[in-house]
């Protein structure tokens, strides 16, 4: 089975965008509950023991707010994942094309396939993050304010949240914490795409070599490579960059979960609530107040979330591409 994310893939920009958007939408809906749990754990300050682990947190949310609370903030999150997936995959495709063109003309200092996947993945991750960051911000705020120990209800809808942040902080308010997001997501996606390609190629080779053995044990020979490669790549990449994700969530909610944020909207006094846009300052605060382990709050649930997310995303991307091409082929055959 071919790897449609390889540097020499024949996939088009339209296919990348459409299949990337579908993959983002499907994966988001499946992992939304784990994302809500992760955000609650990440934003819980040291000393509070209201949420004490994945399953207890999930049970507590359902008990306090109902089952639908596990999909709280899902509308902005779905928009985030659809646009993020589409932007990420089409950017990855175009960066690969640029590097291919460079390698064809370069006499020396050519970029290796592994480095190419990392560069294309990192660029795609950074570009998609910037393009969709306001949706990520809204998703975090909606998920955070649902907590039982949070008495703030500043945000009621996408439009109301947009107006409130714009009035209080101006256009730059929609991008608070974006630097830490880029710092965390760029290497994460670079590592993800680089390792995904390697792992999938190895799994394809294994499947081809041991085809008869797999058949003899009634094991599938196709369809599992994408999900398995995505799972492995997502797990390894997430483990390396998680502290930066915690810093990003703290920057996004800092001050905005304060009762007086809404009251001070449009007034100079609001700046006292928004005293740090610096990820390094935020990292120092977390370490001083909570120790280094504060940077890893919600790590287990994030790891559990990122693995199936990556698996579902890559599987859906490859399968939706296969369906799209089958549909196009059927159309051509009917015309003929």
From Swiss-Prot:
| An example Gene Ontology CC term for this record | mitochondrial inner membrane
Role summary: Mitochondrial transporter that mediates uptake of thiamine pyrophosphate (ThPP) into mitochondria.
Q: How does it sit in the membrane?
A: Multi-pass membrane protein
Repeat (Solcar) positions are 11-98, 112-202, 221-323
What keywords sit in the KW lines? Membrane, Mitochondrion, Mitochondrion inner membrane, Repeat, Transmembrane, Transmembrane helix, Transport
Name of protein: Mitochondrial thiamine pyrophosphate carrier 1
Pfam families of this UniProt entry? Mito_carr
What Gene3D superfamilies does the database record attribute to this sequence? Mitochondrial carrier domain
GO aspect biological process, one term: thiamine pyrophosphate transmembrane transport
Q: Where is this protein localized, as stated in its record?
A: Mitochondrion inner membrane
The record's listing under InterPro entries reads: Mit_carrier (IPR002067), Mitochondrial_sb/sol_carrier (IPR018108), Mt_carrier_dom_sf (IPR023395)
Q: Which family does it belong to?
A: Belongs to the mitochondrial carrier (TC 2.A.29) family.
Which residue spans traverse the membrane? Answer: 17-37, 66-86, 118-138, 177-197, 228-244, 298-315
A GO term for molecular function: thiamine transmembrane transporter activity
